[in-house]
Amino acid sequence: MDDRAELDTTGIVDRAVSAGSHTILAPPHGRGRPSLRNRVALALLTLVNWIVPKKRDKFVLHGIPLCEDGILAVADELFVRGLSSIVLVADHQDATRASAMFCSPAVFVGKRSIAALWHYLTARYIVVSHGLFGDPRPPPWQCVVNLWHGEPTAKTIGRYIGRSRINVTTAPVLSHVGQAYRCTEFGLHPKQVPILGAPRNDRMLTADHAEVRKALLGADADVPTLLWLPTYRSVVNGTATWIDAAVRFPGVPYDLADLRRIDDWLYSNSARIVVKRHPLEADTVNYQFRAIAFLEHTDLERVNETTYTSLAAFDGLITDASSVWTDYLLLDKPIIFAFPDIDDYRASRGLNVEPYEHLVPGPFVKSADEFIQSLDRFLRNRDEFAEARQLARRRFHRFCDAGSTARLLDEILPGRTRFPERTRP
């Protein structure tokens, strides 16, 4: 990271303040407008939501994927404060899976049921990682918290890609940089975007990383291993297809020939890479490697772990436009940015922080040769970006502790004390 490449967010903040809750930046491209039927349904839901009385201290949670780390952290903190939660899930099968992952007591309700809608309408507090029921505008007496699932330091979202304003009460972020972008992405006033940290990071910082490493790597637990978390390029949802880059890759942004070269080098140098594809990624790698393994969400669930409890179990991170690298700064471990299609991605999807190549706190590589060279430096313990990571951590994090969830609930539940005898499960 170049010290001279400072982020100037003043203009963004000024526009956010002056526009109030109607912040607008011209998006580079649009994603389409909801149908008339959906708009009418949303208007009716909004009206009913303003009429139905809310139950004090009633929390409804919803995360994607099923056991999203931020939602799990909130459920645990609610338990510490003597509160329970209702968790919306897809179906009975998901309810069974979730019951094994949620350490704190919760009631699981199918999201498509009348009961789920009634819980939503009667809840004083709604906490989500994405949208829910079309994001109707909540009344002042209902608090809707959108944790989101990453800091806006990489790919564009929300209004930048033509989406409408996100109707929430609170959307916590990590820093002033995140606050500036979140205001414009979601169309929120800065007062709605408090700098509190991210609940998902509490789970990353408090997990038993040695035990998680043993559970995930087994006999290879003593072998140098990096975790590769690429963002998605293609999403297929029913009949809809969303493409963020012109070239389709097999789950990671390199073709099979390059992956085989990287795999051969890793095997020859007694190192490993574990790839966890993005949950939305439609493409997969159909090849058996010797030193590259693939980790699915179900593999984590099998050992009762999640993405964030597993992060520190690895020796370093490989990523591209995934905002996970911002969270990973709290661990102060090496990060490799493998982004061969950045020009294509920049033109198609767009990046928030530019020039991205010069601002990221780690080696930025495109070709397989550059990738292998960065792996070689990693194995030789040539950490040339330690100072850059420290600078990035100061820039992108106000808090570096595991107290983000507590700060969030202090914000929305003023005066609600914690019970000393109740520790997090």
Regions picked out by a protein language model, each given a short descriptive name:
Residues 2-119, 415-425:
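N-terminal pre-catalytic "stem/leader" segment of glycosyltransferase-like enzymes
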Residues 290-299, 323-397:
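Catalytic binding pocket for nucleotide-activated donors in carbohydrate/polymer assembly enzymes
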